């Protein structure tokens, strides 16, 4: 019996962009949000939570030969992003890991709890990339909107749950979080929450599952899995913009412009005709 096009669409737009993130004995989930070729190289980016990769971020006192003294030096260790392979759409048959670099982050202690990874595979684009909810349409997200949470719950291959947006005005460490009833648990952190757009006929990424409600019970605490906090898409966009990666969602900004803002060199192939004219002069 043929698989329903609706089921295929859900797999391709929500399930397959999900990756598992492993970082020095800890782990969680991530979502592929961009994968394009610029010049001769592919550039693939994954969004996750800071607390998923925090063990790979440290600051050490190291000798600076120019300043002639020990200075705080940021050390970023390698992170591993795991893609999954499936048979008949739904049956996971394994995974393969690719090294990735932490290129931007905001610490969990500051309330933001966000990180951006760049996959080191420069030859092959990611096969599936999440559709991002348009920044100009955020005011049309409401309580009772159906949603789906997808992530590597408890370290498993991706698991999908459904629910609805149930609260949009909680503040944790002075930053706004939204809440959904789509069940999430440890390991979902860094994954994705999706909402279907009737207008654009696609499932769209609207936030990062980041926290779960915990109820103290005597000497232990029980997780309330149907009350999960997620970082709303508006904050995700602000973080990307603050770190000069807004080409990921903003069509008015180019990859090259953002790279220049970050002080990175742009390959000649990416500079276009203006670069060629400069060389001729």
Give the positions of each predicted feature.
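Active-site region of chymotrypsin-like
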Residues: 14-19, 24-28, 120-131, 157-241
């Amino acid at each position: 019996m043929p698989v329903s096009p609706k089921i295929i669409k859900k797999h391709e737009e929500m399930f397959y962009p999900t990756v598992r993130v492993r970082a020095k004995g800890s782990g969680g989930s991530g979502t592929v949000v961009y994968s394009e070729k610029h010049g001769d190289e592919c550039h693939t980016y994954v969004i996750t939570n800071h607390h998923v990769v925090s063990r790979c971020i440290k600051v050490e006192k190291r000798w600076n030969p120019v300043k002639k003294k020990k200075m705080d030096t940021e050390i970023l260790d390698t992170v591993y992003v795991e893609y999954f392979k499936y048979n008949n759409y739904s049956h996971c048959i394994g995974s393969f890991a690719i090294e990735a670099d932490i290129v931007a982050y905001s610490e969990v202690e500051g309330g933001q709890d966000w990180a951006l990874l760049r996959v080191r595979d420069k030859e092959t684009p990611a096969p599936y990339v999440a559709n991002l909810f348009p920044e100009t349409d955020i005011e049309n997200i409401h309580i009772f909107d159906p949603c789906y949470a997808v992530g590597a719950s408890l370290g498993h291959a991706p698991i999908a749950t459904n629910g609805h947006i149930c609260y949009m005005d909680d503040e944790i460490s002075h930053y706004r979080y939204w809440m959904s009833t789509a069940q999430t648990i440890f390991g979902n952190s860094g994954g994705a929450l999706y909402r279907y757009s009737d207008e654009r006929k696609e499932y769209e990424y609207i936030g990062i599952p980041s926290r779960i409600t915990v109820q103290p019970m005597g000497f232990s605490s029980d997780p309330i899995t149907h009350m999960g906090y997620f970082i709303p898409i508006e904050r995700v966009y602000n973080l990307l913009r603050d770190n000069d990666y807004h080409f990921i969602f903003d069509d008015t900004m180019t990859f090259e412009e953002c790279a220049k803002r970050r002080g990175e060199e742009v390959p000649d192939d990416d500079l276009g005709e203006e670069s060629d004219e400069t060389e001729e002069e």
